[in-house]
Curated annotation (Swiss-Prot):
InterPro entries: UPF0346, YozE_SAM-like, YozE_SAM-like_sf. Gene3D superfamilies: YozE SAM-like. Belongs to the UPF0346 family. It comes from Lactobacillus gasseri (strain ATCC 33323 / DSM 20243 / BCRC 14619 / CIP 102991 / JCM 1131 / KCTC 3163 / NCIMB 11718 / NCTC 13722 / AM63). This is UPF0346 protein LGAS_0911. Pfam families: YozE_SAM_like.
Length: 75
């Protein structure tokens, strides 16, 4: 089985403190979330965590877009 990086590691490549882009802002804020499941790859587990704990995420559609980029990057 091929190595697959965690969603968090991928998300950290999207950081851009000066950007107004939704995914960049998500990444910037997730970096400061000490409870973020950093080793997780599973959509449902990540989604559950974010719905309950990520007040910094304005909409789950931002996560959906970021997760799709993650999947596209893994293929």
């Amino acid at each position: 089985m091929a190595y697959r990086e965690s969603f968090y590691r991928f998300l950290m490549t999207q950081r851009n403190p000066g950007s107004a882009d939704d995914i960049a802002q998500f990444a910037n804020n997730a970096q400061h979330d000490s409870s973020f499941p950093k080793q997780e790859e599973d959509y449902e587990k990540l989604s559950d965590y974010l719905e309950l704990n990520a007040g910094y995420l304005p909409s789950m559609s931002v996560f959906d877009k970021a997760y799709q980029l993650y999947l596209d990057n893994m293929n």
